[in-house]
Amino acid sequence: MQTIEVNGASPYEVTIGHNLFKDVAKSMSQLGANQAAIITQPVMGETAKKLVGAIEALGKEATIITVPDAEDGKNLNVAGDCWDVLGRKAFGRKDVIISLGGGAVTDLAGFVAACWMRGIAVIHVPTTLLSMVDAAVGGKTGINTSAGKNLVGAFHEPSGVFIDLDMIATLPDREKISGSAEIIKTGFIADTKILSLYEEDPEACFNVEGYLPELIARSVAVKARVVASDLREAGQREILNYGHTFGHAVELKEKYEWRHGNAVSVGMMFVAALARNRGLITDELYLRHKNILSSVGLPTTYPEGHFAELYQAMLRDKKNRDGRIRFVALIGAGKTIRIEDADRAELIAAYETLNKGGV
């Protein structure tokens, strides 16, 4: 078992290990909660029952709230249904929300907890690789609207995060591939050892008996360091958005049918092309993006003919300032910069590079 501290105004621990449900229940008890609401997805039904058993073994009560899968469960109507259950169960300020699922469930559960009685505790138990290294750590919560992804939300740090490596054995390859994008992202912005591990043996990077536990720990440690210094994304935390400006536009264009990691992968290729065209990074670093991402099955291209729609989506990105599209870019492996003055012609050139297969 490994523990990573996330410092800041409300410090908490990220626990990485095996068979952690008893630890989750113990954490809930230490918070003084009498009951928990486990917000989860249909596919996690039997797993949720096991977590209920661990909680009830300590004399506490647990209620399962099942929400629709993926982004279909991340909207105001679903949040309202969750609050209705909390009301019927007379949830008080000492009680706890537990997320058990992927990133969408993590985001939703955090938002539900942030709003109920102006904020109650939430514990995250992420079950996908993506949520383990992304949504579960950092305190961002949110739901989607027709205007875009995560435009309604709050900053609400969890009281604890439990990454149970046993969950990974049940994941289909497509989930492992998508989650790898966020791990690789942290390699490009901060911890280049991550990149070296993927280059050394991509297959071992999917394996709990191989490099995957180290990759998860390294990625979480990067995010923990960044968010500890900038909870509300006022400055340094923005580096975690590497690949996300174009990536979120792709998700919106594809009506959220693309997996988040796949969209971020294409987003990293887009901004790497933008940086290379400006002379900020070398051809070698640009190709390193393409080689590492493609080695694990992530997309590195996007079809032509959609720039106008993607451009409009980027213009609505919540990271923009004064009407300018803002990108996190690299000036070297592990070194970031902001691009805030890219004109339409530059963006078209980067997009055309993406269309041509990144050459």
Curated annotation (Swiss-Prot):
E.C. number: 4.2.3.4
One GO CC term on file: cytoplasm
Biological pathway: Metabolic intermediate biosynthesis; chorismate biosynthesis; chorismate from D-erythrose 4-phosphate and phosphoenolpyruvate: step 2/7
Domain of life according to the entry: Bacteria
Cofactor: how and how many bound: Binds 1 divalent metal cation per subunit. Can use either Co(2+) or Zn(2+).
Catalytic activity: 7-phospho-2-dehydro-3-deoxy-D-arabino-heptonate = 3-dehydroquinate + phosphate
Gene Ontology BP annotations: amino acid biosynthetic process; aromatic amino acid family biosynthetic process; chorismate biosynthetic process
InterPro entries in alphabetical order: Dehydroquinate_synthase, DHQ_synth_AroB, DHQ_synth_fam, DHQS/DOIS_N, DHQS_C
The protein's required cofactors: NAD(+); Co(2+); Zn(2+)
Keyword terms: Amino-acid biosynthesis, Aromatic amino acid biosynthesis, Cobalt, Cytoplasm, Lyase, Metal-binding, NAD, Nucleotide-binding, Zinc
GO terms for MF: 3-dehydroquinate synthase activity; metal ion binding; nucleotide binding
NCBIfam families (UniProt xref): aroB
PANTHER family in alphabetical order: 3-DEHYDROQUINATE SYNTHASE, 3-DEHYDROQUINATE SYNTHASE, CHLOROPLASTIC
Protein name, entry field: 3-dehydroquinate synthase
Species, as recorded: Corynebacterium pseudotuberculosis (strain C231)
